[in-house]
Amino acid sequence: LVNDVADIAVHSLKDVPALIDPQFSIAATLPREDYGDALLLREGLTIDDLSKNLKIATSGPRRKSQLLSMNSKLNIVPIRGNIQTRINKINTDNLDGLIVAKAALNRLKIVHPNMYLFSEDQMLPAAAQGAIGIEINTVELESQLGNLLKLLNDESTYQATQIERMVVASLEGNCLSPISALCKIDAQNAELQVRVSSQDGSKVYNEEVKFNLDNKIDALESFIETLIKNGAKEIIQQ
């Protein structure tokens, strides 16, 4: 898009910075997949073993901090590669477990024999997790592609992910910040949960709000003000 060699970019929306160049915009989102995080465990282990000093791989500070808040003695190690490569590393790298997005497993039709799906209370997802976003050059292509992309757009997913990303941007966070945000929309009613953590998981702050979408701007401004007043920015920097 930047070099003008493509008209449309399709992203895993959770990996797109919350603040993007005003020249571009997320013009549409596809219906959201499962937004949860999955723990793939070595054979013989169960979720109850998470209370032990297990070696768990994850590439994200958000997941790491929430894991450490459950058990500070866990050995959290970074991991890279595509999904299948990561799964193979459970054996090749002597891992006890690996955390991946459930949406990634679903899209690739991967079924792991020893999987645990975290509840929202245990691990709140990243903003826009499970959503596919379509980005365009707004200035040049809105008039040409706007109506077409509206046909692809899932409005509830679009609204929810925009709200989640707005929270991350307001906290000056990015893809690597230990910030979780999940918005659920039912008709015109929205429920937003936010969790921020320190890098080591020793501090966790949760906040939630319910509002009508007609009052979205005022409700979010007040909610974000509460987050900041209660030290959310400071916590994610620790």
Regions found by a protein language model. Name each.
Residues 2, 7, 58, 128-131, ...:
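Short glycine/serine/threonine-biased micro-segments
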Residues 2, 7-12, 96-101:
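Paired acidic/hydrophobic, glycine-rich loop segments that form the ligand-binding mouth/hinge
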Residues 13-73, 140:
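A conserved helix-loop-strand patch within extracytoplasmic ligand-binding domains
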